[in-house]
């Protein structure tokens, strides 16, 4: 009898994965989703933190369920938010890094989102806090209305910061309007050479951490309303007021906090309250915000009728304040995991994930199920009794059974995980984790104190052990990729790549299938594997733009300024890996000078080749750098029309690429390199263009050369 009962319960829980959770006579729960920023696995008390106190977050775990194997689909902010809202892996759309402040809306307005899904079931929907997914159809010029935006993705109401607390513009947006802006003083984006006229913003000290200077002029009143030290208080007040104003309809509140993203600017009441400096004080402010939301639900009388989910967009970042918390107070933001934000190691994407729903979720319970933030779409569809079509379930898996029960088997067959670099796209299946390259695939700064300190150097610095790392560097002879048994070795101390070739082969097949789905620009053929480093090699084609003269000529800069376009480095910035160039020289928009010690993404401009007339065949070359809309190489007709183009993969390493020239035989063409980005991965590197053509001595007439 007992065995029969257990079998019946197991069947009922497992069947939830395939059938709607709510029936017609069920009252749908309210849903509150709190999405913290850069909160690491070890930043919360219920996940082992001892230098901070998080009673409100810990209460959610005490009254709900804590997951120990939850992940963000990306170890980076923008793509993680894309995955959360759409249920789609962001790499499929070429989204690898943070979007530029002027970025268009990255989410197709025809795509189903969790807000649209819930709105179809009668939910009131709102979004508060960090957006960082862009506005508008093309480049955002900040002219009102800011559409498409949150309201076009299913949110009835939005109030928050348009980008992030570390990047401009430093203003609030309400729905599709900039709060406090008037028609006679509009917000204006300023080009780099005009930024002496920016509008003043809240002054900060070095101790608060990294913040990008303002790039905008105008909107003086809007800027005055934004204060870094009251940002969290403002968003909490707006969110709780919205809860208080709800009527009888169920509601969905998505609160994307700016805590604990740099700069670390806790309100005065929280300063000095933790045992790990401003880093911990900011966590205390985050915990207070969670408490305010819970108090609002209780005051409204709906706390027991609300599913509350608390999680983070990615792992903790070892920035200046993270280093201060470790060096001076012993706080380990990602617990004993290897790695940090941006990287493929566990510390980059294993995140806190807690769900509370009285009467449905067992209080104080823990789940070891493998889940991901990309799974919320399918899970909320099941919760509200809405079937998804097959296309909408490709990446998002219904993990609701793991929230409300104890499934005996894994709900996910495998999970694709994306760090900042496309070369390090990874796959998790069961206990196995394959990272298809060496190192972390994230930031690679080698010196403590810097904002980008991470990778092997930082791992050694904090005392992590890994069989591939010796004294902060990847050891000579280390395997070309990484395989870890996370069941036996969650800290990723031993790379088993050479010991289990069959497992590597199986997981690599899954990765190859995933890579084949990545959105590519028309006509561009770029591999996801690094091009090999080779010596200067005379080509057998009639044209060779390989920059081996050490000079830019015959190419020209037609827009912007660059410090050192023709590079000759033998190793990459940060991680020290060998530069995979052809010969000695290459063209890059990353280097400010010949002896620069770090990259300079702030440079922008356009570089063009002379005109040429293709004779057929293909053009082969290498491309590296950012994967965003603002950094790319393009093949153009003489009138400037871009007919083929390609981007990097958010990696300094160059990828093989080729363009088919046969459609353009006899036409005047040119190559254009565009860098319009000034933030992370805001650069382009190209090398070794080989093709058959007649090179002309003139340039496109529409471009004024410098």
Task: Show where each model-derived region lies.
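Extracellular beta-strand-rich recognition modules
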Residues: 547, 619-625, 669-675
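Extracellular carbohydrate recognition
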Residues: 603, 677-694
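Beta-strand acidic-aromatic groove motif in beta-rich domains, primarily in extracellular
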Residues: 557-558, 619-620, 629-635, 682-684
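Low-complexity, Pro/Ser/Thr- and charge-rich linker/hinge segments at domain boundaries
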Residues: 619, 692-706
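Extracellular glycan-recognition surfaces and repeat-rich motifs
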Residues: 551-592
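Formylglycine-dependent sulfatase
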Residues: 2-16, 20-482, 490-528, 534-536
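Extracellular carbohydrate recognition and processing domains
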Residues: 636-669, 674-684
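Short beta-strands within extracellular/lumenal beta-sheet-rich domains
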Residues: 587-619, 629-631, 654-658
